[in-house]
Amino acid sequence: MKYRGFGRTGWMVSEIGFGGWQIGGAWGPVDDDVSVYTLLHAFERGINFVDTAQLYGAGHSEKIIGRALREWNGDKIYVATKAQPTVWPNASDNAPAFRGRFPDWHLRENVENSLRHLGVERLDLFQLHTWAPNGHLELDWLETLNDLRREGKIDQIGVSLRDNRPGEGVDLAHLGLVSSQQVIFNLFEQQPRDALFGAAKASDTAIIARVPLDS
């Protein structure tokens, strides 16, 4: 397995990560024991980065990952999870309002739920599950997340960009307000190369590629 630095966090993460959407049961029943076995096999093969979200099976994916972490006796596994907004922005809206989608009470509730599901004392990477081009101008969400960092409940902060809208993360990357951005990038979706990747490199913001094998 090859590893690379995860932005400015100091982490060395596997170039291949484990996506936790399917083990949440989004596409039908799954065998939880098989899911745990699969995770442990991935860890044994050198994968040390797992991405999940509370949305994935209403927290079920997080719980399965938590089981695997308790059974794992090897090196550090970094787990990234996400909080969905109180209201999802309209996919066709080019400039959705961002303030109020991640209020303080909502973020704190999500952090506590993820801590409980994963069975950990601190979340490695806590991400917003959507974004908007004006999000860097409405920083109520960041104030709360920085408070949670100071409280020791989360380590790093990230965002997951909306589908096929990598340009919405460029200003955020230039400012370096978060440690990572998650974006669709594969053979068919190359837009992040236009501006986002350069901005992220300049601020040492890590990039997580979504659906890299999309077909």
Please provide the spans of the model-predicted regions:
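Beta/alpha (TIM)-barrel catalytic core signal, keyed to glycine-rich beta->alpha loops juxtaposed to Asp/Glu
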Residues: 130-215
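Short, acidic/polar
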Residues: 29-42, 101-118, 162-172
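Active-site mouth loops of central-metabolism enzymes
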Residues: 21-33, 92-108, 130-134
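Structural preference for beta-strand elements that scaffold enzyme active sites
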Residues: 13-17, 48-49, 76-80, 122-127, ...
